[in-house]
C-alpha cells in the first residue's frame, strides 16, 4: 500500500530532481569558466560553456548507460577523488582563515529570524528531492548484488543513508566555516560558485582554481550520473518498457545539457518557484515514511497530508 502511494510522488520527485543536475552543473560551469576566463582569451565564456558541457554530458551519458557498474564508477573512483580534492582545498582555507567567525556580521536577511530564510535557501541543495530519486538507484544496486530480502535491503539503505548524511553534514559545516571566514577577504558574492572560485584563487592561486574545477567536476559528475540513472529507471518502469531505459537516459541527458547552458544565476532564479512547489510535499513524504508505523502507513493519511500542504 505504501509503495503504491509514494511511487507517483517519487516519480515526480525524480523528474524534478533531474533538473537538479542542471543546477549543480551551473555551479560547475561557473567555477570552471571563471578559471578559464582568467587564463585564456581564445574562448568566449558562452562558447566555452557549450563545449565543456557537451563533453561533460557525454561522460554522464556514457556512465548512465552502464548502470550495472555505477557502484564502481561512483563508489570506488569518483567519490574518493572528489573527497580528496575537496579536503585539500578546505584544509588550506581552514589553516589560514581570512577572518574570525565572531567578527563576521550576518547579512540583513539573517539578522532576525534566520531559520526560515536558511530553510528556503537550503531548498537549493536539492538534498531531499535527490534523496527520493537516489533511493531508487540504491535499492536497485543492492538487489543487483543478490540481496532480495526486503528487511535486509531496508537495513542497507538505512545504514548507507546514515553514513551519507554524516558526510554531507561534515561537508556543509566546513564549507560554511570557510565561507564565513572568507568575508574578511571578499565582498558578499552573487552565488556560491563565485565565492568558491575566489577562495580557491586566494589560498592556492591558479593551482587552487584548478583543484576547485577538478573537485566540482567530480562532484557534479557523480550527482549527474545518479540523477540521470534514477530518472531513466523510474520512467522506464512507468512506461512498461515502451520507451527504453536508453531512450530515457538520452532524453534526460539532453534536457540537462540544454538547461545547463542558461547559466548559474538564471538557473537558480528559475528553479525557485519549482522548489517552493515540490519541496514541502517531498519533506512531508519523508517525514510520514519515518513515522508511518504509528498509523500503519494508512493511504488516507498520506493523501490528506499532501492535500493540506
Spans of model-derived segments:
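Select transmembrane alpha-helical segments in multipass membrane proteins
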Residues: 2-15, 47-53, 113-121, 202-219, ...
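Conserved small/polar residues in nucleotide/adenosyl-binding loops
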Residues: 308-309
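Selective recognition of specific alpha-helical transmembrane segments in multi-pass small-molecule
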Residues: 81-93, 157-183, 253, 257
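Hydrophobic alpha-helical segments and their helix-loop junctions in multi-pass secondary transporters
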Residues: 83-110, 128-129, 140, 177-180, ...
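Helix-loop-helix connectors at the membrane interface of multi-pass transporters/channels
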Residues: 24-48, 143-144, 224-251
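TM-loop-TM module centered on a large, flexible mid-protein loop between adjacent transmembrane helices
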Residues: 171-221, 273
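Membrane-water interface regions at transmembrane-helix termini and the short interhelical loops
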Residues: 57-78, 144-147, 257-269, 286-297
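Hydrophobic, small-residue-rich membrane helices and short re-entrant helix-turn-helix hairpins
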Residues: 66-77, 115, 138-167, 185-197, ...
Amino acid at each position: 500500500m505504501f509503495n503504491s502511494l509514494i511511487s507517483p510522488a517519487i516519480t515526480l520527485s525524480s523528474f524534478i530532481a533531474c533538473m537538479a543536475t542542471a543546477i549543480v552543473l551551473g555551479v560547475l560551469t561557473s567555477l570552471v569558466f571563471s578559471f578559464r576566463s582568467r587564463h585564456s582569451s581564445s574562448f568566449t565564456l558562452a562558447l566555452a560553456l557549450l563545449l565543456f558541457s557537451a563533453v561533460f554530458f557525454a561522460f554522464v551519458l556514457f556512465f548512465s548507460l552502464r548502470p550495472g557498474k555505477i557502484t564502481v564508477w561512483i563508489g570506488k573512483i569518483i567519490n574518493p577523488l572528489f573527497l580528496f580534492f575537496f579536503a585539500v582545498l578546505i584544509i588550506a582555507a581552514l589553516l589560514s582563515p581570512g577572518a574570525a567567525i565572531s567578527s563576521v556580521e550576518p547579512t540583513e536577511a539573517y539578522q532576525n529570524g534566520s531559520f526560515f530564510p536558511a530553510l528556503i535557501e537550503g531548498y537549493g541543495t536539492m538534498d531531499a528531492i535527490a534523496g527520493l530519486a537516489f533511493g531508487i538507484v540504491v535499492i536497485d544496486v543492492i538487489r543487483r548484488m543478490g540481496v532480495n530480502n526486503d528487511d535486509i535491503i531496508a537495513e542497507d539503505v538505512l545504514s548507507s543513508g546514515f553514513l551519507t548524511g554524516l558526510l554531507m553534514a561534515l561537508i556543509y559545516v566546513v564549507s560554511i566555516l570557510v565561507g564565513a571566514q572568507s568575508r574578511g577577504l571578499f565582498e558578499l558574492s552573487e552565488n556560491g560558485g563565485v565565492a568558491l572560485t575566489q577562495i580557491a584563487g586566494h589560498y592556492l592561486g591558479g593551482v587552487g582554481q584548478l583543484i576547485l574545477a577538478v573537485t566540482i567536476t567530480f562532484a557534479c559528475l557523480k550527482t549527474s550520473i545518479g540523477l540521470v540513472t534514477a530518472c531513466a529507471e523510474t520512467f522506464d518502469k512507468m512506461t512498461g518498457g515502451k520507451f527504453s531505459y536508453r531512450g530515457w537516459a538520452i532524453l534526460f541527458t539532453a534536457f540537462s545539457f540544454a538547461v545547463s547552458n542558461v547559466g548559474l544565476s538564471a538557473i537558480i532564479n528559475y528553479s525557485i518557484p519549482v522548489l517552493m512547489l515540490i519541496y514541502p510535499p517531498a519533506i512531508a513524504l519523508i517525514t510520514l515514511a519515518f513515522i508511518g508505523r504509528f498509523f500503519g502507513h494508512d493511504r488516507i493519511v498520506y493523501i490528506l497530508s499532501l492535500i493540506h500542504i
